[in-house]
Amino acid sequence: MRIDKNLPNYLTIARIMVIPVIILLFYINNSLARKLGALLFVLASITDFFDGYIARKYNLVTSFGKMFDPIADKLLVGCVTIMLLKKDNVDEIPCLLILAREFLVSGLREFLALVKVSVPVSRLAKLKTFLQMFALSILILGSKGSGIIYLDIVGEIILWIAAFLTIITGYSYFKACKTYF
């Protein structure tokens, strides 16, 4: 099967480009818009898996992809998290823990790249990302968009679990930098 050599990069760019649409749909504030926003967020989240998978499987890894894939992830999660904090009654603590960790780890990754140290992504970190995106999907939809009364509570619980894993998985980056402090 022939794959366009830029497909993983297109998926990464698409993930960034869909962020304003998700936010716009969220602020329209009706059930259909919430459902469409949640669906777009889920699809954008899925591209996070496929861009890396396709790049590795078909040897299409690029410098652009290495740099912008994590940026696209942080933008997607960060913008949606801030949107939910501003508009809905989402607990600030797990959101702030997630955002702080993402900024710190991004800086640590940049530093580690400069000193030629690689920290592989663990299964726990992949689970953390999945739970973050799953929780945010549920919270975008919320009880307002779904009609399911306790959906917000389920989303908050999953967000707290993701925040806990966020702290645990962030430690591996600090540990890798320890010799440079």
From Swiss-Prot:
One MF term in the entry's GO annotations: CDP-diacylglycerol-glycerol-3-phosphate 3-phosphatidyltransferase activity
Enzymatic reactions: a CDP-1,2-diacyl-sn-glycerol + sn-glycerol 3-phosphate = a 1,2-diacyl-sn-glycero-3-phospho-(1'-sn-glycero-3'-phosphate) + CMP + H(+)
Entry-linked InterPro entries: CDP-alcohol_PTase-I (IPR050324), CDP-OH_P_trans (IPR000462), CDP-OH_PTrfase_TM_dom (IPR043130), CDP_ALCOHOL_P_TRANSF_CS (IPR048254), Phosphatidylglycerol_P_synth (IPR004570)
Pathway: Phospholipid metabolism; phosphatidylglycerol biosynthesis; phosphatidylglycerol from CDP-diacylglycerol: step 1/2
Membrane topology: Multi-pass membrane protein
CC per GO annotation: plasma membrane
EC number, as in UniProt: 2.7.8.5
Compartmental location: Cell membrane
Coarse class of the protein's main subcellular location: membrane
Annotated transmembrane regions: 8-28, 35-55, 64-84, 148-168
EC category name: transferase
Annotated GO biological process: phosphatidylglycerol biosynthetic process
Keyword set, alphabetical order: Cell membrane, Lipid biosynthesis, Lipid metabolism, Membrane, Phospholipid biosynthesis, Phospholipid metabolism, Transferase, Transmembrane, Transmembrane helix
Described function: This protein catalyzes the committed step to the synthesis of the acidic phospholipids.
Record-stated family: Belongs to the CDP-alcohol phosphatidyltransferase class-I family.
Record's protein name: CDP-diacylglycerol--glycerol-3-phosphate 3-phosphatidyltransferase
Organism: Rickettsia prowazekii (strain Madrid E)
Gene it is expressed from: pgsA
